[in-house]
Amino acid sequence: MAIDKEKIKQAVRLFLEGIGEDPDREGLKETPERVARMWEEFERMRNFDMKLFEEFGGYNEMVLVKDIKFYSLCEHHLLPFFGKVHIAYIPDKKISGLSKLVRTVRAFALRPQVQERLTEEIADFLEKELEPKGVGVVIEAEHLCMSMRGVMSPGHLTVTSALRGVFLKDIKTREEFLKLVKGV
């Protein structure tokens, strides 16, 4: 997907005018350009090489990366939601560098999104790329569309999960994953 900086700048300027602001005042005159550059930066961060390793000593237990901090934008209100992602997988023939799990989260989070789909997209992508015995993804997030508008009740977490393979089919694997996520 290509970013159209000019359209973004025009849209931000129109938005500012639409809410009664003067887009030419000192604090706002560079805002359209800043927002366009931000989306260009997001687009660059979404592209990465999912380097996989097939020689890893036959490790066949759970690999878990906890507390991956993320932020995204609610596609309904364009307000942030943010929190932590926990990803686990059980290798079959391939493993990933741990940083690639963080990059996977970032790649799917840096666009207008809903948490439920974000959870599914991360799990589906890792299942496709790693071909593991199973994948588990849990996301805990606070949504500013609930905290600063509507019900205006900050501090609540929404928790979503996506389970694939043995994480879905084997209750013991699922329980181990959820206990490790909770830190028990």
From Swiss-Prot:
Q: Does the keyword Transmembrane helix apply?
A: no
What is the reaction catalyzed? GTP + H2O = 7,8-dihydroneopterin 3'-triphosphate + formate + H(+)
Q: Where is the signal peptide?
A: none
Q: Which GO terms describe its biological process?
A: one-carbon metabolic process; tetrahydrobiopterin biosynthetic process; tetrahydrofolate biosynthetic process
A GO CC term assigned to this protein in UniProt? cytoplasm
**Carries keyword Hydrolase?**
yes
Q: What class of enzyme is it?
A: hydrolase
Q: Which InterPro entries match?
A: GTP-CH-I_C/QueF, GTP-CH-I_N, GTP_CycHdrlase_I, GTP_CycHdrlase_I_CS, GTP_CycHdrlase_I_dom
Q: Where does Zn(2+) bind?
A: 74, 77, 145
Q: Which family does it belong to?
A: Belongs to the GTP cyclohydrolase I family.
Spell out the protein name for this chain: GTP cyclohydrolase 1
> What species was this sequence derived from?
Aquifex aeolicus (strain VF5)
Lineage in the entry?
A: Bacteria, Pseudomonadati, Aquificota, Aquificia, Aquificales
This protein's encoding gene:
folE
